[in-house]
Amino acid sequence: MFASLTPRTLTLAALCVAAMLPLSVANAQQATEIQVTYDGAFQPSELRAPAGKTITVKVKNNSAKAMEFESKTLKVEKVIPSKGEAVVNVRAQKAGRYEFFDEFNEKARGTLVVE
């Protein structure tokens, strides 16, 4: 299969792949990273992020029970074990206020403010 490929074709293919790598790295670097801890309540309870950028929420669960980081408006949910950590990836959002909560303790609520 590869025997019919010429050196010129292989070089062109390699250059195309090499040209795409910086773009994927640049896109990954553009994500806004937010840290939040949980121990029966979210700290901080109000998170802020710029509009139009991917958001990475790093959640550290310090409680003795598992929790589920959930947001219906952001369309994300992730179970995080007791004393565990997880990353929740959020797609780029328009400006607005987006509520999140612990599915297992709905009194524990927070807001993501996208500006």
Give the ranges of each region predicted by the language model.
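Sec/Tat signal peptide C-region and signal peptidase I cleavage site
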Residues: 23-28
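Bacterial N-terminal signal peptides
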Residues: 11-22
